[in-house]
Design a protein with these regions (language model features):
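A short acidic, Gly/Pro-enriched loop at the edge of an enzyme's catalytic core
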Residues: 55-76, 80-83
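Structural motif
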Residues: 30-35, 52-55, 68-73, 98-102
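Core SAM-dependent methyltransferase catalytic element
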Residues: 112, 117-147
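Class I SAM-dependent methyltransferase Rossmann-like catalytic core
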Residues: 1-25
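A short, well-structured beta->alpha microelement
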Residues: 15-16, 34, 39-61
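A short glycine-rich, Lys/Arg-flanked "PGG" loop and its adjoining helix->strand segment in the class I
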Residues: 77-94, 111
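Conserved class I S-adenosyl-L-methionine
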Residues: 97-120
Length: 147
């Protein structure tokens, strides 16, 4: 348990939750090589509606938040993961990805990948050991609201 807390204790959980602006009642799906540890840490903090992609059992479109710990993986490999992960998000869901420190070209590539999945970057944070970015679905044809 201490080992897994050390892996996540590098200050990634709190910034990811802040970017997601999620409540403890929302459904959260976690992905990445440390997804099980991330799920247990979120459970420890009172987020009980958290599942990993491996054990979700949720139909597509049911998750309010997707948290992805992508440290140690390439941005190119993230594209393949997003191909199926975005389908778990609800239409108003938010995706937060934590990546290793990277250069500007890699940041542009990440934004480009998000755009190809119809996600618009909302916010981000840069820390010593990496950065996180949040994105939401892009509505190509917003629905008009009639009062």
């Amino acid at each position: 348990m201490i080992q897994s807390r050390l892996m996540l204790g590098e200050g990634i959980v709190e910034p990811m939750l802040a970017l997601a602006r999620c409540s403890k009642q929302q459904r959260i799906i976690v992905a990445g090589s440390n997804s099980a540890q991330l799920m247990f840490e979120l459970h420890r903090q009172g987020y009980l509606r958290v599942v990993t992609t491996r054990h979700s059992g949720l139909p597509h479109g049911q998750s309010d938040v997707a948290l992805v710990d992508w440290r140690g993986h390439s941005i190119k490999a993230l594209e393949t993961t997003l191909d199926w992960l975005v389908h778990f998000l609800s239409p108003t869901g938010v995706l937060v990805i934590w990546v290793d420190p990277q250069d500007r070209a890699s940041n542009r590539k990440l934004c480009s990948i998000l755009e190809t999945h119809d996600l618009l970057v909302e916010a981000g944070t840069v820390r010593e050991r990496g950065s996180a970015i949040s994105a939401r679905r892009h509505e190509l044809n917003p629905i008009s609201r009639v009062a």
